Curated annotation (Swiss-Prot):
<comment type="function">
    <text>ATPase subunit of a proteasome-like degradation complex; this subunit has chaperone activity. The binding of ATP and its subsequent hydrolysis by HslU are essential for unfolding of protein substrates subsequently hydrolyzed by HslV. HslU recognizes the N-terminal part of its protein substrates and unfolds these before they are guided to HslV for hydrolysis.</text>
</comment>
<dbReference type="GO" id="GO:0003677">
    <property type="term" value="F:DNA binding"/>
</dbReference>
<keyword id="KW-0547">Nucleotide-binding</keyword>
<dbReference type="Pfam" id="PF00493">
    <property type="entry name" value="MCM"/>
</dbReference>
<dbReference type="InterPro" id="IPR027417">
    <property type="entry name" value="P-loop_NTPase"/>
</dbReference>
<protein>
    <recommendedName>
        <fullName>ATP-dependent protease ATPase subunit HslU</fullName>
    </recommendedName>
</protein>
<feature type="binding site">
    <location>
        <position position="400"/>
    </location>
    <ligand>
        <name>ATP</name>
    </ligand>
</feature>
<feature type="binding site">
    <location>
        <position position="261"/>
    </location>
    <ligand>
        <name>ATP</name>
    </ligand>
</feature>
<keyword id="KW-0143">Chaperone</keyword>
<dbReference type="GO" id="GO:0009376">
    <property type="term" value="C:HslUV protease complex"/>
</dbReference>
<dbReference type="InterPro" id="IPR019489">
    <property type="entry name" value="Clp_ATPase_C"/>
</dbReference>
<dbReference type="Pfam" id="PF07724">
    <property type="entry name" value="AAA_2"/>
</dbReference>
<dbReference type="InterPro" id="IPR003959">
    <property type="entry name" value="ATPase_AAA_core"/>
</dbReference>
<comment type="similarity">
    <text>Belongs to the ClpX chaperone family. HslU subfamily.</text>
</comment>
<dbReference type="InterPro" id="IPR001208">
    <property type="entry name" value="MCM_dom"/>
</dbReference>
<dbReference type="InterPro" id="IPR003593">
    <property type="entry name" value="AAA+_ATPase"/>
</dbReference>
<dbReference type="GO" id="GO:0005524">
    <property type="term" value="F:ATP binding"/>
</dbReference>
Length: 450
């Protein structure tokens, strides 16, 4: 059954678990257990905020471990969940980290990046609220350049109307704008505060703000280009930076979602001859422990507590097992969800049902060339059949196999579409077979092509 967008009755605590699952169903096929687990975790966040007294701080999120092969929907579930709630969301592969003391990224950079995302989110939101005022101020600055500050109100009004109508878009003006040229020098970390890096430019900005001034330079540019530069400048002046940072830290601490992929790759498998690698992997796990359990991380915006950030870890666990993770880390990921491998029916649903399904995407792309692209039911079934066959015979990459199959299937149509205006193309099972059967039957070729 096709999931459709639904208008829900207003709930003071946000979406209910069943509503969250319904929303996820619009984009993701199957994996009901995983959807249910994340829906409960999200609702529990809302419940915690309504608990009064000291007990609220004692209620911590139940972090999730998703187990399943690639392409079955692990990342997509977490990503859609964050989008659904407008939560700061950060995805990272566990293999990118090294133990503290080794060359590479340390795990605390996860929180620094999460806060950066939260700050940008809050800043964008604040700028939309002052957009009209910022636009008016930008127009006033451009008018000063066009007709002078001492011009009559009648003249200014006349030129303002021309700016708004776009009549002066290609008129060149000379105007002072903020100098964004980076000052020479790199960035350095503040001793004792890893991650709280400060570049020379940042230091200059801080001094400029303290003195209530900033460096500007005069440039020649078109009115339309000036508007694009000055509106963000004026928005920056109108928003309260300190308030935004506080709101962003609060958002990251209470609503942040961190998705750690490939956590199975840092599990100790106990294989001989890889002692150093085992030590390094175990070191990364130990570094992750305080982060997931709850600690304070210093960032350039201030200290951030991780106690109530929701961590979702995932891995295929083909070689390692969840029990190969450190016992302490296993304990900090109490909810385990196993995602099922995709069946032929799942593949058919993935092609047809989601609001942003691949079939709809390709039809829309080709449609921009005034070519109508349609898929017969027999073609959809054949594509799904081939996807399952290659996944079984070559390597199981789940729904991602559909991308490579469709690219190969529609390669000629995509190339020639611009010369086929006004035509209708129907893809049936015979077309699919003609295009792909040689590749599918030759497994050595399929390994490279599909």
């Amino acid at each position: 059954m096709k999931a459709t967008k639904t208008t829900y009755k207003k709930d003071p605590m946000g979406l209910t678990p069943s509503q969250i699952v319904n929303e996820l169903n619009r984009f993701i096929v199957g994996q009901e257990k995983a959807k249910k687990a994340v829906a409960i975790a999200l609702r529990n966040r809302c419940r915690r905020k309504r608990v009064e007294g000291n007990l609220r701080n004692e209620i911590v999120p139940k972090n999730i471990l998703m187990i399943g092969s690639t392409g079955v929907g692990k990342t997509e579930i977490a990503r859609r969940l964050a989008k659904l709630t407008n939560s700061p969301f950060y995805k990272i592969e566990a293999t990118k980290f090294t133990e503290v003391g080794y060359v590479g990224r340390d795990v605390e950079s996860i929180i620094r990046d999460l806060v950066e995302i939260a700050v940008n989110t809050e800043k964008t939101l604040a700028k939309t609220k002052v957009d009209i005022h910022a636009r008016e101020k930008a127009i006033e600055r451009i008018l000063d350049s066009l007709v002078g500050k001492t011009s009559s109100s009648e003249t200014r009004e006349k030129f303002k109307e021309k700016i708004l109508n776009g009549e002066l878009d290609d008129t060149e003006i000379e105007i002072s704008v903020a100098d964004t040229t980076p000052v020479g020098g790199g960035s350095f970390e503040i001793p004792g505060m890893p991650g709280a890096s400060m570049g020379v430019l940042n230091l200059g900005d801080m001094i400029g703000r303290a003195l209530g001034s900033s460096k500007t330079k005069t440039k020649k540019m078109l009115v339309k280009d000036a508007m694009a530069i000055i509106i963000p400048e004026e928005s920056e002046k109108l928003i309260d930076q300190e308030k935004i940072i506080q709101q962003a830290i609060n958002l990251a601490e209470n609503d942040g979602i961190v998705f750690i992929d490939e956590i199975d790759k840092i599990a100790s498998t106990g294989s001989s001859g890889a002692k150093n690698a085992e030590i390094s992997r175990e070191g990364v796990q130990r570094d992750l422990l305080p982060l997931i359990e709850g600690t304070t991380v210093n960032t350039k915006y201030g200290p951030v507590k991780t106690d109530h950030i929701l961590f979702i870890a995932s891995g295929a666990f083909h070689i390692a097992k969840p029990s190969d993770l450190l016992p302490e880390l296993q304990g900090r990921l109490p909810i385990r969800v196993e995602l099922n491998s995709l069946t032929k029916d799942d593949m058919i649903k993935i092609l047809l049902e989601p609001e942003t399904s691949l079939i709809k995407q390709y039809s829309a792309l080709i449609g921009t060339e005034d070519v109508r692209l349609e898929f017969a039911a027999s073609a959809i079934e054949k594509i799904a059949d081939y996807a399952i066959t290659v996944n079984l015979e070559v390597e199981d990459i789940g729904a991602r196999r559909l991308h490579t199959i469709l690219e190969n299937l529609l390669e000629d149509i995509s190339f020639e579409a611009s010369e086929m205006k006004g035509k209708k193309i129907t893809i049936d099972d015979k077309f699919v077979e003609n295009q792909l059967s040689k590749i599918i039957t030759n497994l050595d070729l399929a390994k490279f092509v599909l």
